[in-house]
Design a protein with these regions (language model features):
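Short, surface-exposed ligand- or partner-binding patches at beta-edge/loop junctions that are enriched
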Residues: 103
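Rhodanese-like catalytic fold shared by cysteine-dependent sulfurtransferases
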Residues: 3, 19-22, 32-51, 57, ...
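Charged (Asp/Glu and Lys/Arg) segments that form or flank catalytic channels of large polymer-
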Residues: 25
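Repetitive helical segments and hydrophobic/amphipathic motifs
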Residues: 28-29
Length: 144
């Protein structure tokens, strides 16, 4: 009889442990899903080119000044997203009522910048693959 009770208690502890593990897994899944949500659009080179053909769309390059000098998309405004005052500079330079077409070298920094800008009210579209994809598709860049 004693062994039966011990076995039952052990099983109950195991069930409680499983509930805790399941709860933690579900919480982690929920947090991962929430963190993975984007509040901006990603587009490919063709979509980006069509978007910026509309001159009311603001083109934003978020790379460094040195990268920008090597070549950038026509009409691009440079605001380095790596600077601590990036959002403040963006607020001062970019109209809140216009779509912002954001790019960087590979698409990672611009995705970060697009997320930060949409958090403060901007509508952003990120170029997947960045200027590397743009140039890879033989799209024009300028040094002017």
């Amino acid at each position: 009889m004693k062994t039966c009770w011990r076995s039952l208690l052990r099983d109950l502890r195991t069930i409680k442990d499983m509930k805790k593990i399941l709860t933690c897994l579900l919480a982690t899944l929920g947090l991962t899903t929430a963190c993975g949500q984007q509040n901006f659009e990603n587009t490919d080179v063709q979509g980006f080119a069509e978007l910026i053909a509309d001159t009311s769309v603001v083109v934003l390059d978020v790379r460094t000044a040195a990268e920008f000098a090597e070549g950038h998309i026509q009409r691009a405004i440079l605001i380095d997203q790596g600077q601590s005052d990036f959002v403040e500079k963006a607020k001062a330079a970019l109209p809140i009522d216009k779509t912002i077409a954001v790019y960087c070298r590979s698409g990672r920094r611009s995705a970060n910048a697009a997320g930060r800008l949409t958090d403060v009210g901007y509508k952003c579209v990120n170029l997947k693959g960045g200027i590397m994809a743009w140039q890879g598709a033989n799209m024009p860049v300028t040094k002017e």
